Swiss-Prot record:
Homodimer. This is LexA repressor. It comes from Leptothrix cholodnii (strain ATCC 51168 / LMG 8142 / SP-6). The record marks A113, G114 as: Cleavage. Represses a number of genes involved in the response to DNA damage (SOS response), including recA and lexA. In the presence of single-stranded DNA, RecA interacts with LexA causing an autocatalytic cleavage which disrupts the DNA-binding part of LexA, leading to derepression of the SOS regulon and eventually DNA repair. It catalyses: Hydrolysis of Ala-|-Gly bond in repressor LexA. Keywords: Autocatalytic cleavage, DNA damage, DNA repair, DNA replication, DNA-binding, Hydrolase, Repressor, SOS response, Transcription, Transcription regulation. Gene3D superfamilies: Umud Fragment, subunit A, Winged helix-like DNA-binding domain superfamily/Winged helix DNA-binding domain. It is an enzyme of class 3 (hydrolase). Belongs to the peptidase S24 family. SUPFAM superfamilies: LexA/Signal peptidase (SSF51306), Winged helix' DNA-binding domain (SSF46785). One of its GO terms (biological process) is proteolysis.
Length: 231
């Protein structure tokens, strides 16, 4: 196993911010948000640090999107092991020798209005992944259709890992149902209901009235699997 790349203190702080932002909102921060957090004069300074992290192999930068930052799987594993190291030391089996936990998740296809999203007839197939890939334990997968969340780094054909939830905080990326349509959007509560906000200026905000009978929050985005990983 390769040694973890040596990061400067600032690079480690930025990496920690990326991880915590993904856990909190389901998406990485923008360059502008990183610059604001650390008091940089411009987003260009944040970009320089991100390029350095990419050269060291801990993140991947995706072109054409302001949130195009992805943690490499080895980075996620390292973060996960660091968090669990204290627990692992309580057992006789060294943490490095413990087999990675596996999760088998159903992929939800088309959904019929009025029936539970995880009803058997909605399950297309299942995939198995290592648990460390996700910020929180997901309950199911949903295939992204379209480019409405492009600027959050979520592209057509990707799989979203979803944790069931009945509540969401403003700014979190959610999976919501409108009748027989399931959509991935950013959540914002307004005085008159819920706004489902795309991350692409070519798409309109969807406003859902507070008393809408056809609306349901199905869960929170807790992970992303690129469609290229499934080939």
């Amino acid at each position: 196993m390769q040694d973890s790349p040596k990061l400067t203190a600032r690079q480690q702080q930025i990496l920690d911010l990326i991880q915590s932002t993904i856990e909190r909102t389901g998406a990485p921060p923008t360059r502008a948000e990183i610059a604001t957090e650390f008091g940089f004069r411009s987003a260009n300074a944040a970009e320089e640090h991100l390029q350095a992290l990419a050269r060291k192999g801990v993140i991947e930068l995706l072109g054409g999107t302001s949130r195009g930052i992805r943690l490499k799987s080895d980075t996620l594993r390292s973060i996960n092991e660091s968090r669990l190291r204290g627990i692992g030391q309580q057992f006789s089996l060294p943490l490095s020798n413990m087999p990675p936990a596996q999760l088998t998740l159903p992929l939800v296809g088309r959904v019929a209005a009025g029936s539970p999203i995880l009803a058997q007839q909605h399950i297309d197939q299942s995939y198995t992944f290592e648990a460390h890939m996700f910020s929180r334990k997901p309950d199911f997968l949903l295939k992204v259709r379209g480019m409405s969340m492009r600027d959050a780094g979520i592209l057509d054909g990707d799989l979203i890992a979803v944790q069931r939830a009945s509540e969401a905080k403003n700014g979190q990326i959610v999976v919501a149902r409108l009748g027989d349509e399931v959509t991935v959007k950013r959540w914002r509560r307004s005085k008159s209901g819920i706004d489902l906000i795309p991350e692409n200026p070519d798409f309109d905000i969807i406003h859902v009235p507070a008393d809408s009978p056809d609306f349901a929050l199905e869960g929170l985005a807790v992970g992303l699997i690129r469609n290229t990983m499934l080939m």
